[in-house]
Amino acid sequence: ADPIHLDRQLEYCDAQIRRTLNEADQDSCLMPRSMEANQTSWNMSNIYDWTSGFWPGILWYDYEATGNEEIKAQAICYTECLFPLVTSAHSADHDIGFQIFCSFGNAYRMTGNQEYKAAILKGAEKLAKLYNPKVGTILSWPGMVKRMGWSHNTIMDNMMNLEILFWAARN
């Protein structure tokens, strides 16, 4: 097997992130989500999409690897776009863990900003409210219970969202 050159891989990732930032409307809270085959521009999503925390999280990881303050500024901007997920009456589903911990979790880890810690704790609280003690799992999609006539639904993704609950319990 060929050796992995981590520095080169991180440089490539950083270049892709910068390219994406150049293409994105930075006065917007739309997040790059996906790109179809043969497409040259990103499909964007709003903050309520289940993937919305990934882009700020990627920016935080890039900042951690490069120390680039411009990347940090963008990471802060896109992270703070997600505050309405925890400060409004937004009805969360299990994806709140992805949305909040990838973004605010990394932001808090790298800055120590107490507002970010509060956002993580509020996100964890919203997720914990979806726990059903009868079933012993977290409800994935509250909106589907009534619509589909399900008494409860839990999908595998919930396992990935437990991290925010464990973190909140320690903090």
Please provide the spans of the model-predicted regions.
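Glycan-recognition and catalytic cores of secretory/periplasmic carbohydrate-active enzymes
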Residues: A1-N171
